[in-house]
């Protein structure tokens, strides 16, 4: 149905750094006074894999049970990493962008219809609409990426 990628935010009003390359992302994370990431699968990836791929020691704090963006908005952390769809709705932060694709971790969302569904035709119609070109602007506005069929 859609792919979800990891992005980075800073507090609203802070300078918006460039993270278009691995080197730029590494510099931003290295120079940040504090880094936050979620306790979800994307945060585990950041903690266990991203820093290694960037060739730097792990840095930051895993935030449990609350959106990372909220902690950045309050000023508790300078930068935050989480899935884009979870960062975009947070007020008080500036979305910097997605991390570079070669160090990215993508979560793919898929859907299916159970064999014993009470309304399989309606479910099929809904899924077909959600995957249609007409629905993609809305999907993308939430921070998710369309999947080619």
Question: What would you call each of these model-derived segments?
Answer:
Residues 2-149:
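Exported/periplasmic ABC-transporter solute-binding proteins
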């Amino acid at each position: 149905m859609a792919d979800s990628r990891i992005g980075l935010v800073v507090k609203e009003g802070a300078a918006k750094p460039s993270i278009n390359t691995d080197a730029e992302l590494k510099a931003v994370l290295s120079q940040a006074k504090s880094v936050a990431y979620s306790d979800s699968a994307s945060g585990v990836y950041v903690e266990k894999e991203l820093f290694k791929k960037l060739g730097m020691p792990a840095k930051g704090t895993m935030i449990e049970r609350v959106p990372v963006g909220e902690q950045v908005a309050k000023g508790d952390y300078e930068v935050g990493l989480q899935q884009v769809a979870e960062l975009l709705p947070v007020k008080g932060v500036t979305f910097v962008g997605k991390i570079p694709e070669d160090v990215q971790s993508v979560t793919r969302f898929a859907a299916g219809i159970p064999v014993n569904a009470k309304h399989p035709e309606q479910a099929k119609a809904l899924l077909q609409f959600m995957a249609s070109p007409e629905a993609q602007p809305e999907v993308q506005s939430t921070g998710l990426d369309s999947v080619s069929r």
